[in-house]
Each structure stands twice: as structure tokens, then as C-alpha cells.
Amino acid sequence: MKSIILFVLSLLLILEKQAAVMGQKGGSKGQLPSGSSQFPHGQKGQHYFGQKDQQHTKSKGSFSIQHTYHVDINDHDRTRKSQQYDLNALHKATKSKQHLGGSQQLLNYKQEGRDHDKSKGHFHMIVIHHKGGQAHRGTQNPSQDQGNSPSGKGLSSQYSNTEKRLWVHGLSKEQASASGAQKGRTQGGSQSSYVLQTEELVVNKQQRETKNSHQNKGHYQNAVDVREEHSSKLQTSLHPAHQDRLQHGSKDIFTTQDELLVYNKNQHQTKNLNQDQEHGQKAHKISYQSSRTEERQLNHGEKSVQKDVSKGSISIQTEKKIHGKSQNQVTIHSQDQEHGHKENKMSHQSSSTEERHLNCGEKGIQKGVSKGSISIQTEEQIHGKSQNQVRIPSQAQEYGHKENKISYRSSSTEERRLNSGEKDVQKGVSKGSISIQTEEKIHGKSQNQVTIPSQDQEHGHKENKMSYQSSSTE
């Protein structure tokens, strides 16, 4: 009975303090109601004394209440109070206070009335964030396995007010660790999706050869030869809190996120020769060399729409993070007419560079593609040695010849493919479409060679060759 009376008195003190705060915010900053001061230090002793007597009547169990107050910025008042109570532990109270001027708001007297009725071993933390009239409350009970002793001794409340926030262009992740429990919240982002669904970790050696030949000379043959040699393969399926959703369109929309992480020496060689004229020759050469540079290309929300493409469209979305030495050589050779020749040559060499291509939320729409569109979606994280060879020769017309050759070789690498929940919508494709999303994290030595010759007319010749070689990469 005595404890109930003391608790009621403590609640009355809290109400008086709150009335004082509201009176100060209402415009009477200089004059406060009677019985209350700007900093309620005089009433603090009775308040805590009442709660100590109340807690002393309890035989088992303990609870801890932590108050965090954020008063309006216009009042220049931010006050935090950390109150830790341990029952049957000689009434020890740990209080940390930070006053920056102004008054305090006590908004959780109802929570106190509910927390003291809890049984033994229950531990509650009440955090109130009050900014501009909005209050966010989070109640956690992480440490239920600590207070199982009858006396309730040894209970400690740990609270770390650290928040790690990652804002990646439509992907907002907020990780807050409180009392050893981490909570992830997404705020301020219209698009929130976690892209971790499937993991393949290859530790030792992996050799993959894929051959796919398409011949359309009156008959159709399809031969696929796949060899996989690997050991210590781990597949993990991660189900995120938010599923990937495809919006902003009714059909033919796919979202890609590609990531390529290379940390040491890289050599990229890509050859692409374009011939578009009849007898003309046009050569473009671009050489780029940098040392200890950081390149970030943010391509958030890019939209690529391809309609009625007649000859071979290739869509590649990559995200590269390179921290070591890299060489990129791109040569593009393609022939669309009989005798035209067009050459575009680009060599890229950088030392200790960081390239980061963020292609979050990119949307590619392909409609009415008549001949062969290639779109690649993979995510690779390689820790061992792997060798991948993909050969796709195909013939689409009588005298046409189309060959796609991809040679991939790496050692001491880690391969990670996340292909869960990926959605790929393509409509109206008449001849063979391949969709690939690549995300590569390379920690060892890798060598990639991609050769794509393709021919779409009777005697035309189109060749796309890309060789990728890297050594001592992390």
C-alpha cells in the first residue's frame, strides 16, 4: 500500500514537470507554474526515492528504464537521462545527465506503471525520441537470459546509441545496435530492397565450360555442355525483409544491380570493331591513365528503352570497385554492311584506382527485339581458382554466322552468385535472348576473355572481343 502511494506521488511529480515544460514552450519561458523550477533538481530526490521504495518491495526481478529526450531544436534544449535501477542490489542507481539548457519532458510515466508489474528476469529499455512534436518509441527486451537468478543481482543495462546508415540511391538501410540487439530500419527512401538472396562460395578450384551452338539452316540444333568441378561449395539463401519489386511499367521491365569489386592489378581488354559504312574507315582512339584516383559513376534511375531492334542488342550493367592497379583496353569491332569499316579503340590504364559504378534501380525495357538480345545478370564472389569458358555459336540466316565466345579464368578467387528473386521480363523476342546480371568480387588472380563475333546479314561480319586479365587481386 505504501509503495502504491509513493508511485502515485511520483506520477504527480512527473505530471507537474511536464506541465512546466509545456508552459515554457507555450510562450511563458520566463514564468513557470508554481511548485516547479526550470531544472527540477529539487523534486528529483522525492521522485527517485519513491521509485526506490517501490522497487524495494519487489522480491524478484528487476527492470531498467532509460529515457532519451530530444526537445525541439528551436528551444536549444537537448537532454538525455540514463537511469538504471537494480532491485535487491543495495539500491544502486547509475544516472548520467547532460543538460544543454532548457527543460525536460517526461513522456513515459505510463510505461513505468506497466514495467514494475513484470516478473523476474525481464529487462526493458524505453527510448523516446521527441523532435518537433513527433515521438518515436522503441521498446526492447534483449537480455532475458541474464536475470534468471532469484535475487536479480548482476543485471546490467548496456545501451549504445550508434546508428550506421547507408544511403545508396533508393536503398536506405539504417542499422541501430541497442543493448546488443541490432535493428534495421529503412527511412527516407522510396525504394527499399535488399539484394542478398543466394550465395555460392567456391573455395577451391572451379572449371566451367559451357558450349551452346545454335544453327538455323533448315534445322535447329542445340547442344549444351556444362562441366562443373568444385569442392567446399556453400549455398546460402538469405530472405530479406523487403522483396525486390518491379514497378514503373506494365511490361518488359527488369531491374539490375551489378557490382564488380577488384582490389589489385587488373587488365581489361575489350575489342569491338564497328563497320557501318561501305568503304570508309574511321578510327577513334582514347587512352586514359591515372594514378591513385577514384572514379564513381552514379547511374541511379537510368532507363534504357529499346523498341523494334532488328540486329543484336547487348545490355550490360556493372558495378566496379577497383582498389589496385587496373588496365582497361576496349576495342569495338562490328560490321553491319558489306564493306564498311569502323574502328573504335579505347585503352584504359590506372594505378591504385577505385571505380565504382552504382547502377541501382536501372530499368531496361526491350520490346519487339527481332534478332538476339543479350542481357547478363550475375553476381560472383570468388575465393578459389575457377575457370569459366562459355561458347555460343549461332547462325540465324542462310549464310550468316554469329559466334559468341566467353572465356573466363581465375585463380584464388571467390565466386558469389546471387540469382534469387531476380525478375527478367522480355516480350516479343523472336530469336534467342540471354539475360545476365553480373556482380563480381574478386580477391585472387583472375583472367577473363570474352570474344563475341556475330553476323546478322548474308555476308556481314560482326566481332566483339573482350579479354579480361587480372593478377594478385583481392
From Swiss-Prot:
Keywords: Repeat, Secreted, Signal. InterPro entries: Semenogelin. Coiled coil: none annotated. GO terms for cellular component: extracellular region. Residues 24-62, 132-158, 173-194, 226-247, 272-474 are annotated as: Disordered. It is found in: Secreted. It comes from the Eukaryota. One of its GO terms (biological process) is sperm capacitation. Residues 292-310, 335-346, 399-426, 456-465 have a biased composition (Basic and acidic residues). Residues 1-23 form the signal peptide. Residues 31-40, 137-158, 174-194, 325-334, 372-397, 445-455 have a biased composition (Polar residues). Its main location: secreted. It holds the Pfam family Semenogelin. Participates in the formation of a gel matrix (sperm coagulum) entrapping the accessory gland secretions and ejaculated spermatozoa. Interacts with SERPINA5. Belongs to the semenogelin family. This is Semenogelin-2. The lineage of its organism: Eukaryota, Metazoa, Chordata, Craniata, Vertebrata.
